[in-house]
């Protein structure tokens, strides 16, 4: 319901890399699961309403790490590799990486 409401106003939702947001089970806290979150969001809202909202907070110390394969900003590309693996086009990945958010900020 919230995703649809944001879609209907032309907004975007950023996927969050914090392991507790990705999955309650530690072994499922992965870049692949994060991509599945994005796929669900795209199914509900359309990929033009999905963005990166990673919130890398590893500098806060233990307990604030990202999910496996996305522990810090140097691994952000793993999310996009996973999006490609599950069928997102190059144009959709580029939109999620930057274009969707830039559109809303304009």
Please report, for each region that a protein language model flagged, where it lies by residue:
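Short, catalytically relevant binding-site loops at active-site mouths
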Residues: 19-22, 102
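Short acidic/histidine-rich active-site segments
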Residues: 15-17, 45-69
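Mid-to-C-terminal alpha-helical segments outside catalytic/metal-binding sites
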Residues: 71-106
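Short basic/hydrophobic patches in alpha-helices and adjacent helix-turn junctions
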Residues: 40-44, 66, 78-86
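Active-site glycine- and acidic-residue-rich loops that bind
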Residues: 21-36
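Histidine/acidic residue-rich metal-binding segments in metalloenzymes
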Residues: 1-11, 32-49
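Glycine-rich tight-turn/loop motif centered on a GG-T
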Residues: 1, 26-28, 68-69
């Amino acid at each position: 319901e919230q995703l649809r409401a944001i879609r209907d106003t032309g907004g975007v939702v950023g996927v969050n890399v914090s392991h507790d947001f990705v999955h309650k089970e530690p072994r499922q806290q992965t870049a692949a699961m994060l991509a599945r979150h994005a796929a669900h969001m795209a199914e509900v809202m359309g990929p033009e309403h999905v963005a990166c909202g990673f919130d890398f907070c590893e500098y806060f110390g233990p307990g604030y790490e990202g999910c496996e394969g996305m522990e810090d900003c140097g691994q952000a590309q793993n999310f996009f590799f996973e999006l490609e693996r599950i069928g997102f086009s190059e144009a959709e990945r580029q939109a999620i990486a930057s274009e969707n958010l830039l559109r809303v900020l304009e």
